[in-house]
Amino acid sequence: MNGLRQNMNRYEQNEFNPLMPHHIVIVEDEPVTQARLQSYFTQEGYTVSVTASGAGLREIMQNQSVDLILLDINLPDENGLMLTRALRERSTVGIILVTGRSDRIDRIVGLEMGADDYVTKPLE
């Protein structure tokens, strides 16, 4: 979790309004990873929503204000990289890709698609 903590420090210092609640959406289809991330960020004081799909993320974003998205690349309903590009075309919300893909090319493509950062699993 150290990599995510470093990213969160950057967002808190540069982009988050400290007077507003910080809403993080975790888009992850693996239940253990969902639970681990949700527990960690809830304990840190963030409001957390969890979904396993791109469709679920869109629904959350239509109904709630979102400050940051933690997005898995391999989702059951769509490619997380393409979802990143679509989100970036419509929004300035922070996007951190959280994935098991550790290849340098995947990282480059993720950032080119509009992600703000790229963190590999397993998370420590």
Language-model features, listed with the residues they occupy:
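N-terminal/domain-start alpha-helical segments
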Residues: Y11-E124
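Intrinsic-disorder-associated, low-complexity terminal segments enriched in Asp/Asn/His/Tyr and depleted
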Residues: N7-N9
